[in-house]
Amino acid sequence: GPVRGVIRIRRAISHSTVTQDLVLHADSSRLDFVTAVDWGDERDVLLKAAFPVNIRSQRARYDIQFGSVERPTHWNTPRDFAQFEVAAHKWADLSEGDSGVALLNDCKYGYDVRDNVMRISLLRAPKSPDPSADVNKQHRFTYSILPHDGDYRNGVVRAGYELNVPLLGAVVAASRGKQSAEESLLAVTGDNVVIETMKKAEDDGGIIVRLYEAHGCRGQRTLRTSLPVRRVVETDLMEKEERRLTIRNGRIRLNFRPFQIRTLKFVL
């Protein structure tokens, strides 16, 4: 249809069955592999997906909490060879010059990139510590391939969040409310600052908002809110108050260092 195209593939692998929906959305370069695996009585098997891409780079970048880290794509030393895979959260990216490819996922954390081949670990059947942990069970997960211009800073961080926290649509009845047709509880200027957390404060009725800089850049950004905030206080990660910030017309100006984490408390 006009929203997305889907191709379904079923295949047998060893003692297991894999069903995949290859989903390409309109106006998007992201290709999703929506996967269901009936993981059979496997032993000493590691299921991976591999993507040979037309990109050459000596280093790949991997998503971690509140940032990302670069690692080599070669296994020239015993130390490199021992890291047959590394941990990452929502994506791994391989870029050169003005283009790159990101490999995204919604619940898998084992990656390896060697030369121009990007791989992600999907399921395991080890002998220890628990040989029955995953076998003879059904598993569902999604991973995606995303070609892009530039490097990871050109939309890859956002794409990782869009896959893991997809937009949910809802139909609501019309009303005569006071809100405008478009409204956000929170919004921040710039693509390099992410609103990671919004939650109730642990010790009082305040609202905790945690942001971080995702591209390794310095700069000033403006946080906007439609909440009736009376006071804004910056805290540490334990929510201990450190200093009061200025808010004017629902806007707060914030300076960020590369990969800096900032935690704010809104007093309503």
For every predicted segment, state its role.
Residues 1-268:
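C-terminal (or distal) subdomains of carbohydrate-active enzymes
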